[in-house]
């Protein structure tokens, strides 16, 4: 039980450091997917997030827009495919 408490406290501190405390679980999952994709693949686009998350296109777009307005994520149009947008973490 003590280990679980320590892990939850660590997670809370990470979310505080990343300014994610005020977001719901869906929004946090989308943020973590972006971070994971960038860390493992070097790139992440909106389609990657939709495919990986299982959330609707609308939910992903609304959340990314929310992150963009909060300066958590930068959205850049892909040079290779003008219909696609690449995501960059602002932190």
Question: What spans do the regions from the language model cover?
Answer:
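Short alpha-helical segments that sit at the start of domains
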Residues: 3-33
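A short alpha-helical element within helix-turn-helix/winged-helix DNA-binding domains
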Residues: 42-54, 67
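Short coil turns linking two alpha-helices in DNA-binding domains
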Residues: 56-59
């Amino acid at each position: 039980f003590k280990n679980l408490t320590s892990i939850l406290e660590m997670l809370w501190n990470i979310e505080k450091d990343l300014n994610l405390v005020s977001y719901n679980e869906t929004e946090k999952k989308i943020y973590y997917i972006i971070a994971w994709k960038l860390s493992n693949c070097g790139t992440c686009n909106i389609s990657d997030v939709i495919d990986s998350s299982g959330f609707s296109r609308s939910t992903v777009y609304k959340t990314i827009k929310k992150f963009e307005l909060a300066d958590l994520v930068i959205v850049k149009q892909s040079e290779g495919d003008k219909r696609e947008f690449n995501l960059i973490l602002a932190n």
